[in-house]
Amino acid sequence: MKKKVLIVGNGYVGGYVFAQLNSNTELDVTLESKATFDYTDEFYLRDYIKEQRFDYLINAQGFTGRPNVDQAEVEKEACWKYNVQVPLMFSRVCKDLDVQPIHITSGCIFTGYDKAWSEVDEPNYGVFNPDASFYSTSKHAFESVNDFGITIRIRMPFCDTLNDRSYITKIHKYDNLIQAVNSKTYIPDLVDFIELLVEEGRTGTDTVHFCNPEPLDTGGVIDLMRTFELENLNWKFVEFETLNCKANRSNCILDSTKVKEEYGFMLPNEEEAFKKALAAITA
């Protein structure tokens, strides 16, 4: 019998997840969004899941803000609703109905280069850090309370198209860049990993850092982009303070060795992933 998968959220990441999982003939996949039904209505969601008998719920919805996370400082109520209240409700409903949730969330709850942060480290850029952005605070708040599901932390996602939410697209269009090294996530790899979780029937509660290892700094990324003739002639490096952002930013490296050691999934390093993405974009 085919596994039934409900994907909630048809944005940047959710759309990618649906496209690949929907092509898997062993899966029966449904994509829902705010435009198709009110997934914030717990009673409706319960009835819907009972009726359809889903095995997995992939939480790909959330508040990120446009054009960036500064918007969370303005729309705090919406940010809290979609990053904290709704995911917690998903976990509660799934636990009651014996459905496995997979939460796609953010690793921006860490900051600093003291170490490569692992899943067992206590987040230092969230609820208990007064300098944290509200976006990071909301992500940490959810995780600090949530007690069910597989939580996948990603950072600065990029893909093999010029999607306006992709790190590559953002870097390409920005004139002013910050020189920093950060973990990043190649979305096609993430989708492969989620597909593996579903195919293998993974269940329970766990947290996984999913970022391509050996992260590049900003200069390394734009050097690769220039190699593929994807360049902005106005690029220049500036100090973060000159950008007049409403919120601080997380800068950190996440340790993603757990993906290989406990899940048997081989992640290419960041340079390989960027080359693959840029080759597809410029083909």
Where are these regions (language model features)?
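Substrate-binding strand-loop-helix patch
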Residues: 160, 180-191, 210-228, 276
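Adenosine-cofactor binding site in Rossmann-like domains, unifying the SAM/SAH pocket
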Residues: 29-48
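Conserved C-terminal active-site "lid" loop/helix of NAD(P)H-dependent oxidoreductases
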Residues: 217-223, 237-283
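Mid/C-terminal beta-alpha module of Rossmann-like enzyme folds, strongest
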Residues: 196, 200-246, 250
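N-terminal Rossmann NAD(P)H-binding glycine-rich loop of SDR-like oxidoreductase domains
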Residues: 4-22
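NAD(P)-dependent short-chain dehydrogenase/reductase
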Residues: 132, 143-192, 196
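NAD(P)H-binding glycine-rich loop region in Rossmannoid oxidoreductase-like domains
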Residues: 42-84
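Catalytic helix-loop patch of NAD(P)-dependent Rossmann-fold dehydrogenases
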Residues: 74-81, 85-86, 109-152, 156-159
